[in-house]
C-alpha cells in the first residue's frame, strides 16, 4: 500500500523512506529530563489515510512499543506515559482508519481490517518485531493482529480486554447508536462516563472524579465528524466478531484490569489470559476500567517492566501475577 505523505520534524530522506527517530547516545539516554523527539507519518492503507506518532528518547533496550488505545482515545492520548517509556525504546501510537484524525471508515470494515492496518504501520516503519500494548477496543485489534501476524510480535500486553462484549453493554450500544445519530451528546456522554467508571461503593478509585469529568467532556464536545465516527464505531462493534478463538502465538503475554473494573472485570481478564498460550494476569489497585489514566506513572512502570522482562512481583500498585495459559502443563 502506498505512503500518502510524511509529516516529520526532520527533512525526509531522498527516497522518501519512513524512519524511526535516531537512537540517542548513552549520555543522552541518562538525561531523562530531555524531551522526547517526535515524528509523525501520514500513511494510506487500502485508500484510507491515517497517522502514526513516534516518540523516542534514550537507548534501544527493547523492541518498539506500539500502543493501541480504546475507541475514544487517539495517538496523543498516551503522551503522559512516554516519560517512562521513551528512555527504553520508541513509542508508537496510531490513529487507525475510522478513529482520531484518520479518514472515516465504514462499518463494513471490521477488526480484521484494522489488524491489517497495524501490520501496515509496522511494515512501513521497517520494524522486525514489536511489543504490543492494546487496551479496550484496541485489545480486540491487538489479539487479531497476534493471531494473523504472529511473526511481528515479541510480547503482548492486553488492558481491559475480554473474550466477549458484556451483554448489557451490547444492548446499550444499540440505544447509544440512536442517541449519537440524533445528536444527543450530553446524555450519552453522561451514560458512557458512568459506564466506564465503577459505581459508588465498589471501592476506592484514584482520580475518579477528575477522570469522569474528562471522559464526559471528551464525549460531549465531539464535533459532527467525530459523532459520525462514533456512530460508525458502534455499528462496527455490532456487525463484527469481537474475539475469535484462533491460534495465538506462544509469546510472553500479560493481561491487566483495574481492581474495581466493572466493565471488563478481573474475572473476564482471567478468562482472556487463559486463552493465551503463555500469560500472566494482574490487577492495578485502586483503579477501574480507566486504569492507564488513573495511575499513569504506575501503569507506565508496569508496561516498562513487562517489555524489558523485569520482575512483576511485589509491586506496590498491583496484585501478584497469576499464571495462566493454554501451554501450561496439566
Predicted segments — roles?
Residues 45-48, 53-55, 92-137, 301:
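Active-site loop/oxyanion-hole signature of alpha/beta-hydrolase fold enzymes
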Residues 48-103:
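Conserved HGGG/HGGXW glycine-rich cap/lid loop of the alpha/beta-hydrolase fold
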Residues 71, 134-139, 258:
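Conserved alpha/beta-hydrolase "nucleophile elbow" surrounding the catalytic nucleophile
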Residues 279-330:
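Catalytic active-site module of serine/aspartate enzymes centered on a nucleophile-bearing elbow/loop
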Amino acid at each position: 500500500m502506498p505512503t500518502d505523505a510524511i509529516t516529520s520534524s526532520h527533512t525526509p530522506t531522498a527516497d522518501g523512506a519512513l524512519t524511526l527517530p535516531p537512537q540517542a547516545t548513552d549520555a543522552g539516554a541518562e538525561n531523562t529530563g530531555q524531551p522526547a523527539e517526535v515524528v509523525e507519518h501520514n500513511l494510506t492503507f487500502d485508500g484510507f489515510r491515517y497517522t502514526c506518532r513516534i516518540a523516542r528518547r534514550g537507548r534501544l533496550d527493547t523492541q518498539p512499543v506500539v500502543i493501541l488505545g480504546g475507541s475514544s482515545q487517539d495517538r496523543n492520548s498516551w503522551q503522559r506515559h512516554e516519560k517512562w517509556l521513551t528512555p527504553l525504546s520508541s513509542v508508537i501510537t496510531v490513529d487507525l482508519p475510522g478513529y482520531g484524525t484518520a479518514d472515516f471508515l465504514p462499518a463494513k470494515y471490521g477488526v480484521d481490517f484494522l489488524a491489517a492496518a497495524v501490520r501496515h504501520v509496522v511494515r512501513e516503519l521497517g520494524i522486525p518485531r514489536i511489543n504490543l500494548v492494546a487496551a479496550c477496543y484496541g485489545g480486540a485489534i491487538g489479539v487479531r493482529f497476534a493471531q494473523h501476524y504472529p511473526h511481528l510480535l515479541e510480547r503482548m500486553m492486553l488492558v481491559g480486554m475480554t473474550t466477549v462484549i458484556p451483554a448489557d453493554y451490547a444492548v446499550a450500544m444499540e440505544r447509544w447508536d440512536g442517541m449519537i445519530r440524533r445528536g444527543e451528546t450530553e446524555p450519552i456522554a453522561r451514560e458512557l462516563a458512568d459506564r466506564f467508571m465503577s459505581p459508588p461503593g465498589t471501592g476506592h478509585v484514584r482520580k475518579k472524579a477528575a477522570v469522569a469529568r474528562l471522559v464526559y467532556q471528551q464525549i460531549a464536545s465531539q464535533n459532527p465528524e467525530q459523532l459520525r465516527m462514533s456512530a460508525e464505531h458502534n455499528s462496527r462493534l455490532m456487525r463484527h466478531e469481537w474475539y475469535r478463538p484462533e491460534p495465538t502465538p506462544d509469546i510472553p503475554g500479560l493481561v491487566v484490569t483495574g481492581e474495581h473494573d466493572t466493565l471488563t472485570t478481573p474475572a473476564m481478564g482471567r478468562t482472556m489470559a487463559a486463552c493465551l498460550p503463555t500469560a500472566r494476569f494482574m490487577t492495578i489497585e485502586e483503579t477501574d476500567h480507566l486504569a492507564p489514566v488513573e495511575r499513569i506513572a504506575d501503569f507506565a512502570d508496569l508496561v516498562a517492566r513487562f517489555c524489558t522482562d523485569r520482575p512483576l512481583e511485589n509491586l506496590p500498585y498491583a496484585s501478584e501475577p497469576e499464571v495462566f495459559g493454554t501451554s501450561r502443563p496439566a
